[in-house]
Amino acid sequence: MRIDLTDLSYQAFEQLSNPATTSFHASEYLQSRLQIREFYPTLTKMYSGNDLMERLLHAFTEAKPALSSASISRNLRNWTNKKTVPQNREDIFIIGFALNLSESQTSYLLGFISDYGIHYREPRELAFSYCLRIGRNYLEALDFINQLPPIPPLKKLPDAGFESVRTQTIMDHFSNIQDDETFIQEFKNNLTNFGVLHLRAYDYFIKSFECLKNPYPSFDPASSDFKVEEYSIERVMDDYLTLHMPVGKKRSNYSLIQKMLKADWPNATSLTNILNHKKDVSRKLLLLLYIVTEGVLNDDYDELDEEYLTDEQRLDEHWWRINLILNECGMNELDPRNAYDWLVLYSLNTNDTIGMNEKMEQVIQFLFPSH
């Protein structure tokens, strides 16, 4: 296997890759035995000093003078007691600066609480990443941001479909900059290239969505010809993407795992908003599209079709390919100790007798038996 895993992650992997793990057993494992990776323990592995809480208290008190010390302390206690996690990206940057974390560590924490790591095409996050790199603190980073040239209204809609500058290009321009003068000049050069949405994820989304919306032609006996039918967004959702997941927002009676899996599950409205460039492509949707299409978007030769590959080799290759996609899109790689990722990996471990989407749907049916 090409993926390096910790002991706990490997235990989770062994369970999902075991041929004896049926869909029912998978649902039970998710509900009661999977050791979910948690925010605060992850943070303590990045910063092992004894003054972690003191640093965070000082940093948030400086960064948010309008909040009382009691309110800040309560938030920090909730994080350490695993009751909540930071809810906005700015808080993660404050943590990154307070603990002298690297860009990659801060980006990972952002991806931990949201769909994406540092968004290098978003000017504020780009400036934060530079300030992390050169060792500034949060307040110094804010001062630096205030010195930057005014930014035109950020674009939500890609120019000419797919011709906007991608995040990777921005990263390449800025990743090695170590001084303010060079950063500001490059910043000026890219003012029209900044944007809000993640375009690479949209690229992957639209390719997969088009495959589902325009399935292979079917033979029409009435006309003795092949007919191409374009599916509606609602039909794509119903036929391919629901997978027995309950609809609606009610979650009060759900377990933690049920809430994790149902959260941000796509629906026809969210698909429409993504297609209209009003909403970002979620990590959950991107992975779901891979499962439903099995990573196949055309008829080109693929080594995964070869019979000499073992199930273990196929799983390893799918895992590797998905991680490449996630990295390209600025998302965290698959984590066997993340509930949804575990389900994705379990679904990838399939053979000719059952499709990936069927395998995922069976587990969801056991997890939500009354729906």
Functional labels for PLM-detected ranges:
Residues 103-158, 304-356, 364, 368:
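Short amphipathic recognition helices of helix-turn-helix/homeodomain-type DNA-binding modules
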Residues 57, 61, 66, 96:
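The alpha-helix within a helix-turn-helix
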Residues 2-60, 147-148, 153-155:
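A short, Lys/Arg-rich alpha-helix, primarily the initiator
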Residues 157-329, 334:
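Long, charge-rich C-terminal accessory regions
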Residues 62-91, 109-115:
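Recognition helix of helix-turn-helix/homeodomain-like DNA-binding domains
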